[in-house]
């Protein structure tokens, strides 16, 4: 058999193998290519459960306390393939839950535990998640037993809670409701570094959406910045990373100390004994990674972080030993068996139990970042208070742990299960209880009063969009429910200036209707859409679901809500001054946060432009002579080859469209507008609506996408 005739998949042919999805990708040739593909993540094509599956309904069939009992049994059912420290997986499951939730960042609301992402790359193979593949596999028999009645995302967090409870700790509660997805969240920017554990400075962290000091870590390097072994210099990095998760100093101290009250780290030998992570491991390892050639590779020979630290005399039982040991002893720097920097209590007796040999005792050990809680002045004050008041520490940790593990779930209305705390917490963006649903007659009366105001379709639509478009699909915050546009800080946002002028008139109607202001705002937008569609020759009724309520200023964390402003809203042609990111990139970001598909994005932009909804009243992208008519003019004029476009200055932010022959300026546009003609994917979508038979479809698609945005935060309708 000649070389030329050998099978190309046999491994014996020197010719390049042709594989599906292989070869040089578009992003190689055009690394700045617009990521329109991010709008098509998590489609029905990747979901094996189908579009009719309802997790909330399935969860209600669950025997919740039987599930808890089964998870508790797993804790002490040590497996030979991954033996439990002290015969108990408590520390491992706490770390599993912590690291599932700890990727959340409040800046853009992405990351976190809400979608079970730790099952997928890159998180399943982050250096900081080493050995959590074993924790997930330990839970598989439980997941297999209960099936779709419990998601992996909920199971990870619940396992952490049960681990704490089994140690004698009283948790604050648990809310289920995290729905699994079936592929990685490719929209999350984990950083630009191309090497694991590449370091970032604290100033850059504080001004970014990144939640870790190094690529592949959950928070900070436990050896200190760049493994310096300096507890004091670690403080600003700790504050920056935990601060990006909305944690204050007390919560930081409570979380670090509470998380390190139980369990241990693993560093039996140098890292050169450790093989590939799960994504890079050989197929026969069946999704496991970090195979360890040192000794048995498990148990006393385990290598995870490379650190070998046990903080407490009772590492499977809740105690105050972390703080007692932290302040009782003088700490001397040492190296773990793996060569990592850690600290040992030089003046202590050997009082720490060995995890596998009860005849062996060790001296207390700490991480560099643990000592930060003693040597940073502000952290030290809190730590001493917790030292002297163990109950205050336990209460603070219980609340901080609940916040850590639920911060990305959105409003409490999404929580499921019998252990949801009754208390409303400010970070949950609480809302008043809903009153009686308004009748059809009262809705019709309110619509008539809105029409009587004589406001334009664009004014009505602009207000509703400003109210609803703050929604973030990552952490389920924002949206029209609550009418937060009437409160600080949203009422003062520059981008809402014209919308608030309309809001003032809608507010005056509230007393004479049976609707909440939040409902009135959305209804006003619907009226505007209906008027614009009628002007285009289509009589439609935009779906309206009443039941929204009005938040109080006292229920609104101004600093937290300020983050919902974001960097841009390309739907209104607004971009924050000083932001250098191209507008079209931020438009995709905004659309992805609104959970829009590429076709929905296209329909909404085309409709909003012809209605004249730019934040400042400018004519950029308003490619029509019939402003207020829900026409396809945006698309037909954008794709009209009689127009030629050029930037008005060197920034290439604003463009003029001139008649190709006469040179007369016909339109102006931003990058948000022209991208629907320049990007090949978005142009293909724009062409659908620019075609002769696209008018009715456009109106239908716009109304559907509009209604979706108006209801994004209506979790009560699910």
UniProtKB/Swiss-Prot annotation:
Enzyme Commission code(s) on record: 1.11.1.21
SUPFAM superfamilies in the cross-refs: Heme-dependent peroxidases
Residues bound to heme b: 260
Annotated coiled-coil segments of the chain: none
Any one GO BP annotation for this protein: cellular response to hydrogen peroxide
Needed cofactors: heme b
Xref: NCBIfam families: cat_per_HPI, PRK15061.1
Highest taxon, organism lineage: Bacteria
Membrane-spanning ranges: none
GO molecular function: catalase activity; heme binding; metal ion binding
UniProt catalytic activity: H2O2 + AH2 = A + 2 H2O; 2 H2O2 = O2 + 2 H2O
The record's account of how the chain is modified after translation: Formation of the three residue Trp-Tyr-Met cross-link is important for the catalase, but not the peroxidase activity of the enzyme.
Name of the featured protein: Catalase-peroxidase
Physiological role: Bifunctional enzyme with both catalase and broad-spectrum peroxidase activity.
Site of covalent link Tryptophyl-tyrosyl-methioninium (Tyr-Met) (with W-98): 219-245
Assembly and binders: Homodimer or homotetramer.
GO cellular component: cytosol
Site label Transition state stabilizer, positions: 95
Pfam families the UniProt entry points to: peroxidase
Cross-link (Tryptophyl-tyrosyl-methioninium (Trp-Tyr) (with M-245)): 98-219
Record's keyword terms, sorted: Heme, Hydrogen peroxide, Iron, Metal-binding, Oxidoreductase, Peroxidase
Cofactor note: Binds 1 heme b (iron(II)-protoporphyrin IX) group per dimer.
Family per similarity comment: Belongs to the peroxidase family. Peroxidase/catalase subfamily.
Organism of this sequence: Acinetobacter baumannii (strain ATCC 17978 / DSM 105126 / CIP 53.77 / LMG 1025 / NCDC KC755 / 5377)
